UniProtKB/Swiss-Prot annotation:
It catalyses: [protein]-peptidylproline (omega=180) = [protein]-peptidylproline (omega=0). The gene is tig. One of its GO terms (molecular function) is peptidyl-prolyl cis-trans isomerase activity. This is Trigger factor. SUPFAM superfamilies: FKBP-like, Triger factor/SurA peptide-binding domain-like, Trigger factor ribosome-binding domain. Residues 165-250 form the PPIase FKBP-type domain. Involved in protein export. Acts as a chaperone by maintaining the newly synthesized protein in an open conformation. Functions as a peptidyl-prolyl cis-trans isomerase. HAMAP family: Trigger_factor_Tig (MF_00303). Belongs to the FKBP-type PPIase family. Tig subfamily. GO terms for biological process: cell division; protein folding; protein transport. It comes from Campylobacter jejuni subsp. jejuni serotype O:2 (strain ATCC 700819 / NCTC 11168). Gene3D superfamilies: 3.10.50.40, Trigger factor ribosome-binding domain (3.30.70.1050), Trigger factor, C-terminal domain (1.10.3120.10).
């Protein structure tokens, strides 16, 4: 096997590899001999399977394993020549060239190493911003939202017609072709008008009804309705309204304050207002950081700090962005890309600049996290994945296993580190901004 290594820049090197067919064959036979001692095959006793039988059945798998072993050996040889250690590598070696002819393999690999980054003066790049303000109106609206969660429907005493937002207590029975259908009847059913819980047209048909009134409401079941025998059918619902209910929002008394402020010894409107103010401010700040500040800061970091990027990582990121974009391409575009290598390469190259920025920012964030001692442990990682699973109604353990199988845990961890990092950077900044704002007022 021939291996020639060449350093391209501070973080990239090439390894030109030539593996003779005889070496591949020899490695395949060695693996077959080892496998023959443990493999189980009908017609042979354990440990007595002939090498020829193993080769015949598992030649493809053995060849793949043999080539993988030989390339590992080639990479180790290249690292020795470059006077580098395996632990210095970042990402997997990237195949820039791979040719197979007459059993011989000629390949060129890109070996990438972690760049050394100095982020002196990064604090000056943190964008200035005004601390989010919270108005009394916003606090009152948030209080109303909280109280509505404890609201209960109560029958109205005044005589008026049913309107959207009311709760109706009524009987109904549905008919298709003048025949009652199963599951289409109920008594004293309570429905919020406007909630769109019933099929289109039903709730609109009830608007304007008065207590004691009976009415036939004509509707059409959607074509995609769950019950196939009703899908797309015209129907008539005979409805009788018994009661109109309105949501009664509770008073903000001492009892309600205790519910809204559990564990608070001195539960009061003032304490609630202060907590809601802090909550709203944090929500605004979180939105500001994610919608504006993170992007500005990231762009400034990318522009200021320049260093060699690991080519293999950039190529892998480019491939990933290209694959993700495939979901947005039209069938015509996909066919054109499949038919033309030039067009495919041109389209792939269009993602290169964004891939470079993404890789560059990843290394900068990683270095910033170390400078500011930001870490994410395994427990935090698992909790984040479990929370995501609960949010989307998925099995948390299966969701975690899927991330493991896809090799996506490092990406999730990096996203969590990034979130903690930006919080660490911008939250203290708020306190400084408040002090600056106060001083500016005093100076005026």
């Amino acid at each position: 096997m021939e291996v020639k290594a060449k350093q391209l820049d501070s973080v990239n090197a090439t390894a030109s590899v030539k593996i003779p067919s005889g070496m591949i064959k020899s490695e395949v036979e060695n693996l077959a001999k080892k496998a023959s001692k443990s493999v189980k095959m009908d017609g042979f006793r354990p440990g007595k399977v002939p090498v020829s039988a193993v080769l015949k059945r598992y030649e493809r798998e053995l060849t793949q394993d043999a080539e993988q072993n030989l390339f590992k050996s080639a990479v180790n040889s290249a690292l020795q020549e470059l006077k580098k250690e395996n632990k210095e590598l970042v990402g997997e070696p990237y195949f820039e060239k791979f040719d197979r002819k007459d059993g011989e393999i000629i390949a060129e690999l890109i070996l990438s190493f972690k760049p050394e980054i100095k982020l002196e003066g990064y604090e000056k790049l943190i964008p200035e911003y005004q601390t989010p303000k919270v108005s009394k109106k916003e606090i009152d609206e948030k209080k109303d939202e909280l109280l509505k969660r404890f609201a209960t429907p109560e029958a109205i005493k005044t005589k008026r017609a049913l309107k959207e937002g009311d709760f109706a207590k009524f009987d109904f029975e549905g008919f298709v072709d003048d025949k009652a259908f199963e599951g289409g009847k109920a008594e004293n059913y309570v429905l919020e008008i406007g909630s769109k819980q019933f099929i289109p047209g039903f709730e609109d048909g009830m608007v304007g009804m008065k207590i004691g009134e009976e009415k036939d409401i004509k509707v059409t079941f959607p074509k995609e309705y769950g019950a196939a025998h009703l899908a797309g059918k015209d129907a008539v619902f005979k409805v009788k309204l018994h009661e109109i209910q309105e949501l009664k929002i509770p008073e903000l008394d001492d009892e309600m304050l205790k519910k809204l402020l559990p564990g608070e010894e001195k539960a009061s409107v003032e304490v609630l207002d202060e907590k809601l103010k802090e909550q709203i401010k944090n929500e605004k700040l979180f939105k500001l950081v994610n919608d504006e500040l993170k992007g500005k800061f990231a762009d400034a970091l990318i522009e200021k700090y320049n260093f060699d990027l690991p080519k293999g990582i950039v190529e892998q990121e480019t491939d990933m962005q290209m694959r993700a974009a495939f979901n947005t391409f039209s069938e015509k575009e996909i066919e054109e890309l499949k038919a033309s290598k030039e067009k495919y390469q041109e389209k792939r190259d269009s993602f290169k600049e964004e891939a470079q920025k993404s890789v560059k920012l990843t290394f900068i964030i990683d270095e910033l996290a170390k400078l500011r001692k930001i870490e994410v442990n395994d427990q935090e990682l698992i909790q984040a994945i479990y929370f995501e699973a609960y949010r989307y109604g998925m099995n948390p353990k299966e969701h975690l296993e899927n991330y493991k199988k896809q090799g996506a845990l490092p990406a999730v961890k990096m996203a969590l580190i990034e979130e903690k990092l930006f919080n660490d950077i911008f939250i203290p900044k708020t306190e400084k901004s408040e002090k600056v704002s106060k001083k500016e007022k005093e100076d005026k």
